């Protein structure tokens, strides 16, 4: 089945689209990537999303218009990714997260993604699955991470323990025990958000460059600096890093306000811009490793990286150094595009919903049971 996956992550760097040919349903899942591309948001839409993610208030009427505008741009991405390719039969669209509240005591998680599925279905003429996270939160889960079931199907190894480490705006992991140890799908699998990924680094670059630079290309700016280990240790004492999984987070915790805290913490050290950025990059790498050492049943035999962080060579180098001697590869090296992996994942989740198959892993999200993820919109 030809399916389009669409997502814009917490970095808000554009709409990632993937057109894939899918077959199989579980460990027999086969994925062929036919096309992948990132389509930048129009600047007015991107600016509004970033303002909203910073916690700035906007009138309800503007929120409604933004919801529709995001859907229009997602629909356009779905139309463009099909050019010169086989026609798609289905769309799985994550939308744009603008708010995520994890489970807090007896208060359930809440998550809000914009980009109406009905509009995407109408504009493309394709059945569209959206709003994937709500069924999991309604079952008592965090609503995140949702990619773990895909990771099980695509990256499980007969003998090796693997960690699939996504570094998007927020970093998250899936721990996969050897298949020889798994009696049924999901048993022994763990996953959670480890903490900040690219979005905090992007915010820092935008602040330090006075808005002239959106992100640290290949990590070259941070690579010119030296991490302040005292600051890294201070930041690693944040309660989130000590919280046992299942857990999830977002810009609400590691966003603009957190960056301002980090800048204040750094003042006594008189760091250069390069040193500050190197220190923040070290926080992302060190927090990932801390999560492994604190909460995994055993360290992995291999780490597979995916997401935009794969393009940050300095971050990848620091993570590999901190994990020595564990090999750190990208999913490119085992046959799946690291850049397109999240878009591929939501194509698969949409496909499973269309087939009436569950998409969450309760051991990862904390949900009480497996559930069908997403809402189906058809047109006409």
Curated annotation (Swiss-Prot):
PANTHER family reported in the protein's UniProt record: ANHYDRO-N-ACETYLMURAMIC ACID KINASE
Keyword rRNA-binding attributed: no
Pathway(s) annotated for this protein in UniProt: Amino-sugar metabolism; 1,6-anhydro-N-acetylmuramate degradation; Cell wall biogenesis; peptidoglycan recycling
Gene3D superfamilies (alphabetical): 3.30.420.40
EC number(s) per entry: 2.7.1.170
Keyword entries, A-Z: ATP-binding, Carbohydrate metabolism, Kinase, Nucleotide-binding, Transferase
Catalytically driven reaction(s): 1,6-anhydro-N-acetyl-beta-muramate + ATP + H2O = N-acetyl-D-muramate 6-phosphate + ADP + H(+)
Matches recorded under CDD domains: ASKHA_NBD_ANMK (cd24050)
Protein role: Catalyzes the specific phosphorylation of 1,6-anhydro-N-acetylmuramic acid (anhMurNAc) with the simultaneous cleavage of the 1,6-anhydro ring, generating MurNAc-6-P. Is required for the utilization of anhMurNAc either imported from the medium or derived from its own cell wall murein, and thus plays a role in cell wall recycling.
GO BP terms: 1,6-anhydro-N-acetyl-beta-muramic acid catabolic process; amino sugar metabolic process; peptidoglycan turnover
Descriptive protein name: Anhydro-N-acetylmuramic acid kinase
Binding site for ATP: 9-16
